[in-house]
Amino acid sequence: MIPAGVDITDLAQQLHEDGVAYTNPIHGQDVDLNADVAKGLKDGDGIAVVDVAANRAPDVRDIAQELQDATGLDTVVVQTPQYVSSVSDTYSRADIEAVQPHLAPGLAQNELLNQYYAGLDQISFPVSATVGSVTLIAAIIFVSSYWAAVRR
């Protein structure tokens, strides 16, 4: 549930501009701050700093999901006074949930993004290597079985 006081439309509009959004209008209009934070984002990602108290962490994830749906961004990180949450089309839910507990809500946005991406890059699962290994093992088993059957 989206907490009262969170204007998804306004945040989405800010995210469309430079990938950075604030509920605080002073920060939202600070061009230098937004440009500095935007440098820490990967292409297609966004961050929203929401100065509204959320009662539960899933509410913050709901904000992130609504913003992703409204903007089409690949990954949306939402920082509130109590929680940090995100949704992504690139990173798995399990990887995101492994990183989020290590992100303190009060971090500066650049530091938050550095820790977020570093944590995700560290635990990224090597899909290509795993698929290649499984394929190789399956081929060895197939060839061994074939030769065993031909010899009989």
Sequence positions of predicted segments:
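Active-site phosphate/pyrophosphate- and oxyanion-stabilizing loops and adjacent acidic/basic residues
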Residues: 65
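A structural boundary signal for the start of the first folded domain, especially the loop/turn
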Residues: 1-62, 85-152
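A short, hydrophobic beta-strand-centered structural micro-motif
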Residues: 68-83
